[in-house]
Amino acid sequence: MALELTEHQLNKLRDFLDEILLDVSQKYQKKFHPGGYQKLEELAFDLEPYFQVVSSIPLEKHTFLVTNFTLRGIDFFVDTIVGFPASPETTFKVFSLLDSLCLRLIQSGNLSTTDTIRLKSLMENCRMVVISKLSDVQGYEMDCASIFEKSLNSIDF
């Protein structure tokens, strides 16, 4: 039986996740300055709890919430990658976590066609951004090709 969150709990959860993204976004805006991020690793560390909480939300009753926060988080992370020097290990670590989260969403069978298309498009865009970002770094070509591989292979259209 899936855990059913009350309206109050859902509001607190939304506020908590919004607050994490807001805090990370504000520190990102100050990157390379005091109080801001100096490296992608720092941003990824602060963003990890966001994705851990999103991945723990029961999908059976809250697919819309999980989908929305997953899409927002992925979109935010891929936008921030370009603002830092290439950091392959951190990039692939985060995308491995995101691939698992997306795969869970896809395999739930609860995604609408529209959300599936949005998710697929975002995952493909992420691949292109990472390939472009790491084009000057040797030895990561196969890793770039594997970003969201499990999730993209699970989409049936």
From Swiss-Prot:
GO terms for cellular component: nucleus; transcription factor TFIIH holo complex. One of its GO terms (biological process) is transcription initiation at RNA polymerase II promoter. It comes from the Eukaryota. InterPro entries: Tfb6. This is Uncharacterized protein C1494.09c. It comes from Schizosaccharomyces pombe (strain 972 / ATCC 24843).
